[in-house]
């Protein structure tokens, strides 16, 4: 992270806000960055999403609440929140798509994104769920510090490049 980014973070930034359709290009860029740099962490692939039209990303923004961490240099982190639509599951929501650009890590941006999603959901749902790949110890610690507890282990949840990845299921 260059000095300007570091200064932005230490001076109270980033600004955490819900993304809108006007953020579709920035969202596409950070999403593809995550899929390329950390393919084991996402169910989708870079190859699946790189050729999707911008309208696909706009629609994704409108179908969920996606929080973004904004610095002067642009969008450096995202996390999605999606409430269940089925009547018997409307008391629950799913945290998904968490990603912070490598150069913006270790500055508490992930913590701020999770706090924003949890705060937003608190008046609307009773339970938040998420899945995190077992190897991602940093994310698992972040979620545990935010009050999430492990309740399950999904074996072979994802398969990428011939390798299986297990997920830890967490709830708050």
What residues fall within each predicted segment?
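Conserved N-terminal entry element of GNAT/NAT acetyltransferase domains
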Residues: 1-22, 29, 33, 168
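Conserved GNAT acetyl-CoA-binding A-motif
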Residues: 121-131
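Short hydrophobic/aromatic beta-strand or adjacent loop that forms the aromatic wall/cage
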Residues: 64-66, 165-169
């Amino acid at each position: 992270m260059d000095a300007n980014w570091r200064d932005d973070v230490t001076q109270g930034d980033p600004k955490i806000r819900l993304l809108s359709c006007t953020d579709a290009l920035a969202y596409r860029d950070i999403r593809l960055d995550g899929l390329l740099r950390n393919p084991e962490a996402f169910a989708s692939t870079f190859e699946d999403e790189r050729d999707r039209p911008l309208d696909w990303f706009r629609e994704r923004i409108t179908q969920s609440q996606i929080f973004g961490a904004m610095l002067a240099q642009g969008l450096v982190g995202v996390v999605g929140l999606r409430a269940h639509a089925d009547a018997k599951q409307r008391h629950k929501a799913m945290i998904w798509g968490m990603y912070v650009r490598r150069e913006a890590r270790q500055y508490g941006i992930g913590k701020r994104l999770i706090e924003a999603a949890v705060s937003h959901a608190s008046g609307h749902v009773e339970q938040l769920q998420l899945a995190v790949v077992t190897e991602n110890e940093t994310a698992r610690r972040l979620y545990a510090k935010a009050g999430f507890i492990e309740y399950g282990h999904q074996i072979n949840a994802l398969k990428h490049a011939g390798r299986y990845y297990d997920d830890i299921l967490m709830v708050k």
